[in-house]
Amino acid sequence: MAGHSKWANIKHKKAAADAKRGKIWTRLIKEIQVAARLGGGDANSNPRLRLAVDKAADANMPKDNVKRAIDRGVGGADGANYEEIRYEGYGISGAAIIVDTLTDNRIRTVAEVRHAFSKFGGNMGTDGSVAFMFDHVGQFLFAPGTSEDALMEAALEAGADDVSTNDDGSIEVLCDWQAFSAVKDALEAAGFKAELAEVTMKPQNEVEFTGDDAAKMQKLLDALENLDDVQEVYTNAVIVEE
């Protein structure tokens, strides 16, 4: 996408996250439970749990909440046996959308996801219909003004795969998703704190939306995001605010 919108988009995303912190905590608790159930309660030897715990810290979740979620996952308590299901579909003008869910009732979840797609101008696709348009990566975004040369040296030494500067001056670092925690630790040790650091499904190509189409696409994305069983929504659509 055009680099000018990178920084605006991430600031918008952070503001939206702050506005719905309670919902984010609920999602993180589910993810922590599942990660602990599948890989054990030690974040040092469980990369998925480490990532979830780091996200919880970034979201200012109390450590007691994190510990309880880990204990529930390890102990197999009621509510910890969520099923991971990915749905794929299309938004306005065929924009690609991936919806990752954790659910204890797949019939309810698929009905809710399908309803959101159909109500707001999209449609469900089949498994694999759009996932090939995305790459599973670790992504870091640094504020404009960050020293590009110093960051590039630190990032490549840490094991990152790509460093690029956007038109707005922000710098993006990409790495293999499995190397995310190691790269994050190395960058922070070198004095670089990312404004955004996440494992994500990054679209290979992006499509910008403006005007009415942008508003329609945002409504669809919001409807999917607001479903209780939804953990993450990924899209190749970029909403340009005019």
From Swiss-Prot:
Pfam families: TACO1_YebC_N, Transcrip_reg. It comes from Burkholderia ambifaria (strain ATCC BAA-244 / DSM 16087 / CCUG 44356 / LMG 19182 / AMMD). The lineage of its organism: Bacteria, Pseudomonadati, Pseudomonadota, Betaproteobacteria, Burkholderiales. GO terms for cellular component: cytosol. It is found in: Cytoplasm. GO terms for biological process: regulation of DNA-templated transcription. Gene3D superfamilies: 1.10.10.200, 3.30.70.980. Belongs to the TACO1 family. The keyword DNA-binding applies. NCBIfam families: PRK00110.1, PRK12378.1, YebC/PmpR family DNA-binding transcriptional regulator. Keywords: Cytoplasm, DNA-binding, Transcription, Transcription regulation. Signal peptide: none annotated. It comes from the Bacteria. Its main location: cytoplasm. The keyword Lyase does not apply. InterPro entries: Integrase-like_N, TACO1_YebC-like_2nd/3rd_dom, TACO1_YebC_N, Transcrip_reg_TACO1-like, Transcrip_reg_TACO1-like_dom3, YebC-like. This is Probable transcriptional regulatory protein Bamb_2332. GO terms for molecular function: DNA binding.
